[in-house]
Structures are given as C-alpha cells and as structure tokens.
C-alpha cells in the first residue's frame, strides 16, 4: 500500500490544457473514484499517475518518492484497462502469470501468486481455459488478477466495467469493492457512472473541464454539493433546478419566490445572497413530497410516467424549471400522462445556487454526514 499525492499537477497537449492545477491527497488503503463526464480529464489524470503520460507541470508522489520522471514499471502501480487486453492464445494461468515470467520470477513464487489471486477472484477452476471460453465478467476478473499478482502498491482501474451489461456491472462493482476491502489496498478507479462512484468509493473526486470540482465522501457530495455542477452530476435521477427570486435575506435563512408567486424560507447561509437576486433552487426528485406535507407547492402537467414497480418517476412540465421536473415516489402512483399534478417542496431539503454556480451552504443536518 502507498499514498498518492498530486501537487498542482497540470497536463497539456500542445496549447490545450487537459488537467488543470490538480491538488489531491489519497491516503494508504483508500478507495478513491475519479468521476465526471466524457472529456473531463479523469483518464488522463490516471495515466499521469501510471506514468503512461508525462506531467506537464506540478509534482506526483507515490509514498514519499517523487515519481514525475520514474518509469511506469518502477512506480509500483498496476493498471486495469477498459478493454481486457488478454492474450487470446494463452490460458488464464499464462495470462495472469505473463508479467511475472517476463520479470523472471521464481516458478514457485509465480504459482503461489497466481493461485492466491485465482482463489480471491473465484477463478481457480478456470485456469486452464482460454479467454474465448469465458464470460465478460470472468475476463474482467482475469484482467484484475493479472494486476493483482504483480502486488502493486497502488491499483489503477480505468472504466473497467463499461463493456459489461447492466446486470453484470452491478455484480462486478460489488466484487471489486469486496476485493479492495479484503486486500486493504490503495485503489484509484475512473468512471463516468456516478452510481458506481457513490456505491464503491471511500472518497469521490468530481472532475469538470480538467479541474477538481469537489472532493468528499459520497453522501457529503450528495447532500452538500459545493456547486451546481456537482449537484446535477451526483444523484440519479439528477437534481431538479428552477429559477427563483430572492425576497428576503437573513444570515441563516433566505426567502425565495417561485415562478408561481409562492414564497418560503430555506435554511442556508445567507451571507453571500442579496435581496432581488435571481438564483437557482435545487431539489432532488426523491425529496419532493405530496402537496399536503410541504412548505410550498408547485403545479405541473404530467409529461411522462415511469412505473418501475418499487417506485414511480413522474416528469412534470413546470414554468420556471430548467427542464421537466422529476418527481420520484417509492410506490406505484396513480397518475397518467396529461394529468395536472400538485407536489410539495420541503424547505429543509432545498439547495440554492448563485448565477455562477456556487452553492449557498446548507444548514440542515442530514443523517450519516459529518456536518461542519
């Protein structure tokens, strides 16, 4: 195990800056997920840590050693790619042991490591098979096993589940999480799927346009996003946003007015808000309520109804909203397309964002989150 430290790291291709002033501390044994949309620089940053890309400026440390100019093979990292990159003519044993054989490791040591990795990954009965005889999930486990036998200080995984179908992805993310907990290893995992990030990570790093937008525990990012980008990216379905007018301001609460004229107080830090400002109110679909239980109500026309059995998702056309408002209830809801529906907004669940995307600090204490 080893810690990973990035100090003001930048990566550029010519005049195009991809990773921008990244400062990050990853502790020994921590499971960290880099998440963000396509093109945000998450895979580039991972490749810089691996040594597959040169760092343009800044410093990278693995443990106490500066690694900027150290060869990839000497950094003590192991990488699993999106593609399995298995040798099709070799069986599983030979695929997993290939790197050790190149390093001229002792035969007994190779056998010991491969057998141990195969036991952990439940591949022991498949070691004589070739990759073509395996399922996608089994192939991905072989790719992980090949990295595991090298006993790296840091595991790097670049979107390893994106080639798998939805059901297998759920199973594999649980297996990878279990493996990391079992080994206690430092693991950095790249994905564009925020559900993977939320379910697997000790700590999430949200990237946007090459910058680190926010770093924190999954529930911290979910309940207390520092900006509108993180609020909209973390959570599925994503947060609803609607335009509001600021009626009154106090130090620990702000009174907002919806497009329908309804006003109510939100418990947020009001020290950066001015009366008369135009701001964005955010509310998650699962936090909306029936109209009788809330501090404020909104009316909309039902555009789409998704009945999933255990829950219902309703898409409402609403004046003042940036897009259709999604209302999510953990039950079957008796509503159809074209109906008029009134739903409620609980003030303590609301988020408030400035026009530049900055969030006002929420003052409501959510369960399971360290609150400062």
Curated annotation (Swiss-Prot):
Enzyme class: translocase
The protein's Enzyme Commission number: 7.5.2.1
Pfam families documented for this protein: ABC_tran, TOBE_2
Record membrane topology: Peripheral membrane protein
Keyword Cytoplasm found: no
GO MF annotations, alphabetized: ABC-type maltose transporter activity; ATP binding; ATP hydrolysis activity
Keywords (A to Z) from UniProt: ATP-binding, Cell inner membrane, Cell membrane, Membrane, Nucleotide-binding, Sugar transport, Translocase, Transport
Subcellular location: Cell inner membrane
GO CC list: ATP-binding cassette (ABC) transporter complex, substrate-binding subunit-containing; maltose transport complex
Top-rank taxon, per record: Bacteria
Main location: membrane
Annotated SUPFAM superfamilies: MOP-like, P-loop containing nucleoside triphosphate hydrolases
PANTHER family in alphabetical order: MALTODEXTRIN IMPORT ATP-BINDING PROTEIN MSMX (PTHR43875), MALTOSE_MALTODEXTRIN IMPORT ATP-BINDING PROTEIN MALK (PTHR43875:SF3)
Similarity comment text for this entry: Belongs to the ABC transporter superfamily. Maltooligosaccharide importer (TC 3.A.1.1.1) family.
Role summary: Part of the ABC transporter complex MalEFGK involved in maltose/maltodextrin import. Responsible for energy coupling to the transport system.
NCBIfam families found in the cross-reference section: PRK11000.1, PRK11650.1
UniProt protein name: Maltose/maltodextrin import ATP-binding protein MalK
Naturally occurring in which organism (per UniProt): Vibrio parahaemolyticus serotype O3:K6 (strain RIMD 2210633)
